[in-house]
Amino acid sequence: MYKKMIDILKAELVPALGCTEPIAIALASAKAREVLGEMPDELTVECSSNIIKNAKSVVVPMTKNLKGIEAAAIVGLIGGDANKKLEVLTTVTEEDLEETKRLLATGFCQTKFLQTTEKLHIIVRMKKGENSSLVELVKTHTGIARIEKDGVVTFEEEIEDCDDSTVDYSVLSVASILDFANQVDIEEVRPILERQIEYNTKIAKEGLRNTYGVNVGSTLLDVYGDDVKIRAKAMPAAGSDARMNGCELPVIINSGSGNQGMTVSLPVIEFGKMLDVEDEKILRALIISNLIAIYQKSEIGRLSAYCGAVSAAAGAGAGITYLYGGNEEQINQTIINTLANVSGIVCDGAKSSCAAKIASAVDAAIVATMISLKGKGFLSGDGIVKDTIQKTIDGVVTLAKEGMQETDEVIVKIMLN
């Protein structure tokens, strides 16, 4: 089981440059250009509603200020390197950017709504005379399921709900996660977690220093002061400020999301520093926070109308409770307290206001932690709270997957009209 847990961390905690939905579009486009082997005359991108929602209003990385599906597809075509996966746009040059802007102005890229049961689904088609290519990406941000050249399928693969199909999420439960975090040889996971600390702290500090979006992170510190409870919210919010508004620094993601990767890690890091605990304890707390978030999202799915900052913040709260010396019952109660409070936050796409939602979710997690450390918490029958942690999480999964299905459709309609 321990090896499977380590495999999950290795598969999930990977670097990504910029918001992952436009990156996924750029990746599919770069791959389609590679398959075609020449500059196309026509480019068409078909996207599921959740991809449209998450790519519509966020700045595409490496483009400075370009937003939207067309920009992501064109810059991926012109300057992307599909071999770099989630860092596909690290090769983009100024010349590539100028050509992207020129093609955008001509209406070169056509976009279509893709009728599909999948939340994460992209099809990119290119044509050059009689030649054509097609790349289909489904379920995960790097999950290329089908490639066609001149109408002939050259590659086809069944995609699992994780970028690494060998990963087994069935081992995850709150109890198994806590057992693993307490007993694993920390040296086996240290490089993964220290990279998360390094990358995510760096972009958070960038978001605090400079102007990105509405600067939720720095505003929190300016108005409320430099207290750990404020820093724990301000750091991930600042990272999101930067990431949603074109910052080119990479982030270590969680569950396919940079915002969730920052939400799940930075509050734990800040409380660890304030409590002056040993580095190893911070790393073990990060194991808990990351895996609790992954556990929830592995059931909910990568994209949903349910805001992923909530599941990430619940994980962060669990990690913070661990840092305070909380026992298993208190960690369980922290997760329950968080989910009882903010499970109603909806996802209306990737954009500047994600930073504010992160701050709200982390605030709820901090409150949840302090309540649980006092031996208190919301009880079975308090709304969606059930009599066990497992049943409570199962209920939230049902809420996110089934209850919010129509919510998701209505959100997309509002955004597009």
Swiss-Prot record:
One of its GO terms (molecular function) is L-cysteine desulfhydrase activity. It comes from the Bacteria. This is UPF0597 protein Cphy_1256. Belongs to the UPF0597 family. One of its GO terms (biological process) is L-cysteine catabolic process to pyruvate. The lineage of its organism: Bacteria, Bacillati, Bacillota, Clostridia, Lachnospirales.
